[in-house]
């Protein structure tokens, strides 16, 4: 069945199409138990189920980027891969301005992610999509340790991404960047929600508002399996 494009994503984002669940399940079989047909006869997952959301994003990373053993600790928010990939593509657009209008690729480009978190998602996607090197910093040693477990399972990522513990929460760059070190860009994208509960409430409001607008326009309401 034809897959329509998602609105709002960058033109280079490979997640422009709706999820191909058959392909995702083939590469990540554990996703199968979360995929159901909704009342509109479309495949989807329950986006209010944290385990389903995590497994979907694990499948996206495995299928599209060949990343294995990626996870976030229980109780932590799961970053949506398509949106995080978008962020990387827009950084590439900014870098392109200094590279003859073309997004630069390869390890000659080095980025610094302030607050890379447990998932290390931006360095991972930046390396997978454009081949950039990264340093990811965090003020949480638990976050650094978890990120390192992911990197250790993926040799290419481990080679190109390094994590650093920032001892002082008051400082961003101090005692983090080495004296002879240069970065092409730095980035910082703090979490949008402080807890899973806050994220769930925001998601519920989003679906409710979408349904109100769709009904007003005479369209089919949104089901929570496909918001």
Predicted regions and their residues:
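Conserved class I S-adenosyl-L-methionine
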Residues: 104-117, 135
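N-terminal auxiliary segments of SAM/dcSAM-dependent transferases
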Residues: 1-78
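Conserved SAM-binding loop of SAM-dependent methyltransferases across substrates and taxa
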Residues: 118-132
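Extended hydrophobic secondary-structure segments that form protein cores and membrane-embedded regions
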Residues: 76, 110-116, 163-165, 186-187
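S-adenosyl-L-methionine
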Residues: 139-188
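Conserved alpha-helix/loop element of class I SAM-dependent methyltransferases that forms part
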Residues: 59-64, 82-110
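Conserved SAM-binding motif I beta-strand of class I
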Residues: 133-139
């Amino acid at each position: 069945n034809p897959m329509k494009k998602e609105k709002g994503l960058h033109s280079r984002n490979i997640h422009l199409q709706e999820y191909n669940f058959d392909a995702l399940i083939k590469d990540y079989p554990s996703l199968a138990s979360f995929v159901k047909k909704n009342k509109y006869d479309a495949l989807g997952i329950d986006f209010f189920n944290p385990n389903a959301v995590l497994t979907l994003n694990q499948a996206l990373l495995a299928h599209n980027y060949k990343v294995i053993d990626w996870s976030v600790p229980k109780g932590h928010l799961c970053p949506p891969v398509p949106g995080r990939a978008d962020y990387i593509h827009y950084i590439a657009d900014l870098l392109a301005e200094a590279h003859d209008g073309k997004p630069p690729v390869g390890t000659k480009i080095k980025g610094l992610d302030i607050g890379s978190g447990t998932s290390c998602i931006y360095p991972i996607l930046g390396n997978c999509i454009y081949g950039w090197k990264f340093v990811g910093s965090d003020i949480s040693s638990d976050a650094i340790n978890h990120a390192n477990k992911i990197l250790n399972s993926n040799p290419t990522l481990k080679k190109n991404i390094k994590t650093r513990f920032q001892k002082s929460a008051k400082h961003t760059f101090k005692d983090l960047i080495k004296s002879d070190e240069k970065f092409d860009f730095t980035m910082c994208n703090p979490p949008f929600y402080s807890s899973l509960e806050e994220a769930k409430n925001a998601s519920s409001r989003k679906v409710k508002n979408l349904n109100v607008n769709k009904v007003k326009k005479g369209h089919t309401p949104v089901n929570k399996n496909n918001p």
